[in-house]
Swiss-Prot record:
Belongs to the PlsX family. This is Phosphate acyltransferase. The gene is plsX. GO terms for molecular function: phosphate:acyl-[acyl carrier protein] acyltransferase activity. The lineage of its organism: Bacteria, Bacillati, Mycoplasmatota, Mollicutes, Acholeplasmatales. The keyword Heme does not apply.
Length: 362
C-alpha cells in the first residue's frame, strides 16, 4: 500500500476539487491510502456527497489552519503556526508516515516549506520544478527548471539534465531520452553565458544524449524528451504553452457549438476526434510537476486544478514512488560524487621519478 499525504486546503478550488480528485484517484486504484490534511468540518461532507468505495483508504487529519496566497514569510509561519495543512503533510513525509506529498498551493510556498521540512538530498545543490507536458505527436516531455530558481549556474542545469534523464527512463519508459537546451537559436554560439557554458557541459557528458539547442516555437514538435532552461525562462515557456492550449480548446469549442446545427454536427461527426485532441494537448492530463532534489517525492499540482487534474497528480505521485525515482537519483548523485573525488585525486597526485629512484636506492 502506497501512502500519500494531501494538502486538502491548497489551491484555488480547495477543498472541494482536492477532495473530489482524491476520491477519483482512490476509486481508480486500490493500492493507495491517502491522508487528507485540512478542516474536517469542510472535508467530511464532501466525502459523503461523492461516490466512493474504499473507506479504509482515506484518513482525515484535522487542522483548521492553512496557508493562504497572502502568506509570504514561510519561515516565520513554520515557527508560529506549524500545524497548517501543508506543514503537517510535509512533516508526515519527514517522519516516514507517508511516501509522498501532493499540494496545489502556491509554488514558492511549497518549494520553501519542502526545503525547510524535508531538506534537499545530501548531494543536491538546488531544487528544480520538473513538469511534464503532452503535445500533438502523442509524446510526453519534461521541462525544467520551471520556476524554482530564476537564476542558475551551468553546473545546476547539468545536474538537472542527469536526473531528468532518470525520470524519463523510469516514468516515461524512454530508453535513451534526448535533452535539448531551450534557447533563442539552434547554433552553439547562441544565448547568454549560462546557455553557452551549459552547452559545453552537456556536450562533454557521455552519459547524456544531448541534442543541442531548441527554439521555443518547436516546443510541441521537438525531437527532445527533456527541455532544459533556468526557472525564469522555462516558467514563461510553460505558462505560454498552458494558456495557448486551453484558449485554443475553448475557442474551438465556441466555434463548433455556435448554433444548434453546429452543435448537432459536432456531436455526431467530431466528438471522438475532439476528445482525442483534448487528450493530446490538455495540460490537465499530466496533473503536476515534481520538485526534483528533495528527500521525499513532492508533487506540485496546478493551482487551478480541478478534480481530474488533481487525480492525475496523485496517480503521478504513486508512479514516481513505485519506480523508486528518489532512490535512483540519490544513487546517481553518489556515483557522480565518487567520480568527482577520483578525478580530484588523480589531478592532485604527482609522480616525481627522481624522488622515487632515490627512495629505491636508499
Amino acid at each position: 500500500m502506497i501512502k500519500i499525504a494531501i494538502d486538502a486546503m491548497g489551491g484555488d478550488f480547495a477543498p472541494l476539487e482536492i477532495v473530489k480528485g482524491t476520491l477519483l484517484a482512490l476509486n481508480k486504484n486500490t493500492e493507495l491510502q491517502v491522508f487528507l490534511y485540512g478542516n474536517q468540518k469542510l472535508i467530511t461532507p464532501l466525502i459523503e456527497k461523492t461516490p466512493f468505495f474504499g473507506n479504509k483508504q482515506i484518513i482525515i487529519k484535522h487542522t483548521p489552519y492553512f496557508l493562504g496566497s497572502a502568506d509570504k514569510n514561510i519561515r516565520d509561519q513554520l515557527k508560529t503556526t506549524p500545524n497548517t495543512s501543508l506543514f503537517l503533510a510535509l512533516e508526515a513525509a519527514k517522519q516516514d508516515e507517508v511516501q509522498g506529498v501532493v499540494s496545489a498551493g502556491a509554488t514558492q510556498t511549497l518549494i520553501l516549506a519542502s526545503h525547510l521540512i524535508l531538506k534537499k538530498m545530501p548531494l543536491m545543490k538546488r531544487i528544480a520544478i520538473a513538469p511534464m507536458f503532452n503535445s500533438f505527436d502523442n509524446r510526453t516531455r519534461i521541462l525544467l527548471d520551471a520556476g524554482a530558481n530564476t537564476e542558475l549556474k551551468p553546473q545546476h542545469l547539468h545536474t538537472f539534465a542527469n536526473y531528468a534523464t532518470i525520470i524519463a527512463k523510469e516514468i516515461l519508459a524512454i530508453p535513451n531520452p534526448q535533452i535539448k537546451l531551450l534557447n533563442i537559436g539552434t547554433e552553439p554560439t547562441k544565448g547568454r553565458a549560462l546557455e553557452l557554458e551549459t552547452y559545453q557541459l552537456l556536450s562533454q557528458d557521455s552519459n547524456l544524449n544531448f541534442g543541442g539547442n531548441e527554439e521555443p516555437q518547436n516546443l510541441l514538435t521537438t525531437s527532445a524528451d527533456i527541455l532544459l532552461s533556468d526557472g525564469f525562462t522555462a516558467n514563461i515557456a510553460l505558462k505560454t504553452y498552458e494558456g495557448t492550449m486551453l484558449n485554443f480548446m475553448n475557442h474551438l469549442k465556441n466555434i463548433l457549438t455556435k448554433n444548434f446545427i453546429k452543435k448537432i454536427a459536432t456531436k455526431t461527426l467530431f466528438q471522438k476526434p475532439l476528445q482525442q485532441l483534448k487528450n493530446q494537448i490538455d495540460p490537465r492530463q499530466i496533473g503536476g510537476a515534481m520538485l526534483l532534489g528533495l528527500n521525499k517525492i513532492v508533487i506540485k499540482a496546478h493551482g487551478s486544478s480541478q478534480s481530474y487534474a488533481f487525480c492525475q497528480a496523485i496517480l503521478q505521485t504513486q508512479k514516481l514512488i513505485k519506480a523508486q525515482v528518489n532512490q535512483k537519483i540519490a544513487n546517481a548523485l553518489e556515483i557522480a560524487k565518487n567520480k568527482e573525488n577520483q578525478t580530484k585525486k588523480i589531478s592532485t597526485s604527482t609522480i616525481n621519478p627522481k624522488t622515487s629512484e632515490t627512495t629505491k636506492e636508499s
